[in-house]
Amino acid sequence: ISEIVIENKNYRNDRINYLISKFELDNLKNIKAKFLSGGQKKKLVIALSLLSEPKVLLLDECFAALDVLTIKMLQEIIVNLQNENKITICICDHQARDLLACVDIAMILSNGNIIAEDTPSNLVKDINAKNAYFGDNFKFN
């Protein structure tokens, strides 16, 4: 896949090594993907999606089935990608607390309609978001 995405072999190898390091996969680079844990596979898939340096990245349920340390690492990577690489990242996830910790703007969908859209700190106060998703006892930060 990498040969199709990046023709220049030196640049391709540099990019692969950078992503392996960024996602802390150094000790796994000689292991076949089928032997990786779920969290390791998820990190690998996201790293592969960044190989071509996209301007927009779509992540679906990226926090699902991950341990707390991997979630924290992924949140930091998402924030860094947004800030350093100026990449737009759209995330769809049911783990609101994990999602809100690393985004600038969030939306709540209900029955296919956007019912609330705001910064995370404002969104958790929104009455529509509370009624449809958060409830009264949700605490953020």
Predicted segment positions?
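Conserved ABC ATPase signature
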Residues: K32-L36
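Conserved ABC ATPase "signature" region
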Residues: N10-L28
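Hydrophobic anchor residue at the start of the ABC signature
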Residues: I46-A47
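Walker B catalytic motif
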Residues: E61-C62
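Helical segment within the ABC ATPase nucleotide-binding domain
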Residues: K72-E84
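Conserved catalytic motifs of ABC-family nucleotide-binding domains
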Residues: E53
